[in-house]
Amino acid sequence: MKTVETLNEGLKREYRVTITAKDIDARVDEEVKSIAPTVRMPGFRPGKVPPNLIRKMHGAALSADALNKAIDAGVRDLMAKEKLRPALQPAVTLADGYEAGKDAELTVALEVLPEIETPSIDGLKLERLTVPADDKAVMAKIEEFAAQMKRFEEAPKTRKAATGDQVIIDFAGSVDGTPFDGGTGEDMAVEIGSGQLIPGFEDQLVGVKAGDEKTLKVTFPEDYPVETLKGKLAEFAVTVKEVKVPAATKIDDEFAKSLGLESLDKLKELMKDQVEQELNGLTRTHMKRKLLDQLAAAHDFEVPPTMVEAEFNQIWQQLEHEASHEEDPEAAKAELENDREEYRAIAVRRVRLGLLLSEIGQAHGVQVSQQEMQRLIMQAAQQYRPEDRQRFVEYVQQDALAAAQLRAPLYEDKVVDFLFEKAEITDRETTREELEAAIEADDDSGHVHGPGCGHDHDEKPAKKAAAKKPATKKEAVKDEAKAEEAPAKKAPAKKAEPKAEAKPAAAKKAAPAKAAAEEKAEPAKKAPAKKAAAKK
């Protein structure tokens, strides 16, 4: 194999690689030997077909396999010989006009990771803001949980439905006067203001009463799962059968027993544990952001453009998705476009921090153990259908990129924990409101993207405020526990999407509210309005 460097500019590298016909032909011979025992041909005993006849029968396929293996080996040898650390998968191009029996000319283009001097971890100073899980906080959590379990009771026939009420409806939908599959339903319960249905559907139910018939006009979102309905104007003929109002929930022993607990005291114990975990998550988020700020301020180096572009695309797709669900999607997208470069700067910061954390972790022997990795895989597999879980496990075990995507958030957290141990930490007790305000002031997202990340985590930049433009762009508060559970997006046999019925209930928001038991490390929902961007 011959290699010639044709480009060395910044972090960009390009090579011309020649794989000789002799090397490729030797690999064809290896392929012939490997399949010979299984080849069957009339007139020959099993496994005794001459190699020249095997070549004649399977020549094209054998040559293609041999060429692919030669290319893979050639790229690996190039990486080892030149001591290259690719930022992403190299782009390999076979020259036009290649013919079997001739040398193969390749172009290998890539971006390499920058050479980073191992960051010093001396002198790190952090403040740890702590909030006690007092009785007031515990009761607030119980009340929040009770609100999520709210029930409704029948209202007088004359009551006009208001936001927060529940209406029971029959509906029949049509587009251009033609009914569509899944567009009809009976006795569907709709909570007005819940935001669970197609934008505009619930709002038009305000003021209806039992017995009313009304035609609702809505537009299906552009990202609606039914291809034929995306962006379509639809009409729903609705019959209101009943209006219900929220029933008061009394928090007492009986309420606790309805949840399968012995008493209200037991419920308080359970909720206190959850509040403590949630507050600990907020404390860690704040500390992590302050740590990342210190690292970012102390280091400035070139980062691979392809990594930045991948990260930027991740951010941008999420923001466009969120903008499409605003009251005025076009205005939201136009405003978003004005801030494109600020979001690109966010992507640069995230990538740089990811590289720094990776360098620190490698320099200090931070590792994700086999047992930890196995737990991650099994946790991620639970998000798939039972019959697909084993296929997912096998896929992650065989695909290095998928495994890296799964490992990255945990590895990052372990590096952060290592730095916490090395830092000088001072504790200060505060209130939840002050802690949330401190997080919001930083508005720095908890996950950064390094070379092993794969840039495919379920991290959401903060939704941009619809009415006014914020003064600064920073990162969203992130549920750190969620990132550890995000499966690699390239995994096969993904859990089947529920059949995209076209009834209004099918247009639910992408991120439904979690149950109280799943909110352990999630920042409070009542935090001040988030800023538009996610800085890292």
UniProtKB/Swiss-Prot annotation:
Q: Which reaction does it catalyse?
A: [protein]-peptidylproline (omega=180) = [protein]-peptidylproline (omega=0)
The UniProt entry, under SUPFAM superfamilies, shows: FKBP-like, Triger factor/SurA peptide-binding domain-like, Trigger factor ribosome-binding domain
For this protein, the Enzyme Commission number is 5.2.1.8
Q: State if Isomerase is listed as a keyword.
A: yes
Molecular function in Gene Ontology: peptidyl-prolyl cis-trans isomerase activity; protein folding chaperone; ribosome binding
Q: Which InterPro entries match?
A: PPIase_dom_sf (IPR046357), PPIase_FKBP_dom (IPR001179), Trig_fac (IPR005215), Trigger_fac_C (IPR008880), Trigger_fac_C_sf (IPR037041), Trigger_fac_ribosome-bd_bac (IPR008881), Trigger_fac_ribosome-bd_sf (IPR036611), Trigger_fact/SurA_dom_sf (IPR027304)
Task: Quote the biased-composition stretches of kind Basic residues, using this chain's numbering.
Answer: 527-536
Which comment does the entry carry about domains?
Consists of 3 domains; the N-terminus binds the ribosome, the middle domain has PPIase activity, while the C-terminus has intrinsic chaperone activity on its own.
Q: What is this protein called?
A: Trigger factor
Protein species of origin = Sphingopyxis alaskensis (strain DSM 13593 / LMG 18877 / RB2256)
Q: Which gene encodes it?
A: tig
